[in-house]
């Protein structure tokens, strides 16, 4: 009975009557086929930045602050835009693959390369004038000068994003997750070795840490391109083509819409780092906040993988008209994500006075991070809930809801509350971060939960089935207009 139900995606009455443990096991296997490779891939990519910050942190507090601002603010400004615009391929390549128009995958990827590389050129002034921009934002002269110098060395990193992001989505749309997984693990090892050689053996210091990041990301991107161009994707890649310029403007508008929505969410937490630059002992405050946000972001990669898995499982079951299976898939994903989050939460509290030693040897920074450990634990707990709720909402096709909820929670409530707690209530860096956690992430989690509790799942399943029939067109180019 279990064997047949694991092969059948339809939620039958027999499945409903199975033992709960058996149903959970079957659903978990379906979920982890998606989540497992995504966790490793995301952790590897994020860990490269963590390794870079760790090497810089052991050089000194100013070095840690400068590499943190350069990677989180300067590079992060373009990272969010490029990542969001590349996410348009998740829709377009997925539709082309489903319609068996495999040649269009390569065409869409080339269009994305053109758009993203052009965006990189437009973003160059942010890197070139990083130092004066940071000074205008209130950063100290020593941190702003060194951050600007590091930013110049990170220009190749931005172009590597434009090259690698479309490649990842091109492969993922063809269910080749294992390819990106193994490449990411290999590059992670390479990055650790390269960082050690450049920072310590060749004594390049913080510049060496930035160079290692450039090298690792370009090796990752070129490795994926070698896989694609070496004949392993014969139906979807036939080389470069002028067809990439056909329908180019519609593609630009579709990509830009995805990019703007991603930026609104991503930039809100980066603004916090700039806000701490105006506090007393700004370098200490920025170092502590950066370490806490880095640990939180590291752990968040696990739950972002759950977001992807939940969205796929919910979309699959809704598309099949199985609204009961949709609710069950959502509950299993939520339970497993929260369990992982609670475990990491407990570890964080136990090791609250030791976590910062990964990034720095400064006693003052370690003590400041220790004082913020309970906020870090709360952020980790919310990380285990909020992405899953987002994945469920996105899986139901309510992406616009998520965008408006994010805008309201982070910019209308979160950032103003962070300002009040940090300056008016004089709670410093803990108040700034706490204001965003409770005013932004916590409120967003509650609103998403209310939306889902009040949701009519049976009606949504009917709408999803109708939508699938409507969008089952042989020409994916035409679907750009329907998504707008």
Label each region the model flagged.
Residues 24-47, 151, 155, 174, ...:
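Hydrophobic faces of transmembrane alpha-helices in multi-pass small-molecule transporters and flippases
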Residues 46-65, 134-141, 197-204, 259, ...:
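Helix-terminus/linker motif at the lipid-water interface of multi-pass membrane proteins
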Residues 25, 134-154, 278-287, 351-377, ...:
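Interfacial segments at transmembrane-helix termini and the short loops linking adjacent helices
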Residues 77, 125-126, 141-167, 182-183, ...:
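Alpha-helical transmembrane segments of multi-pass membrane proteins
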Residues 2-4, 116-222, 226:
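Hydrophobic transmembrane helix module of multi-pass membrane transport proteins
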Residues 50-53, 64-124, 128, 164-173, ...:
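Small-residue-rich hydrophobic transmembrane alpha-helices
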Residues 24-27, 177-222, 226, 284, ...:
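Membrane-interface helix-loop junctions in multi-pass transport and translocation proteins
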Residues 2-36, 206, 210-218, 222-274, ...:
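Interhelical loop/hinge segments that connect adjacent transmembrane helices in multipass membrane
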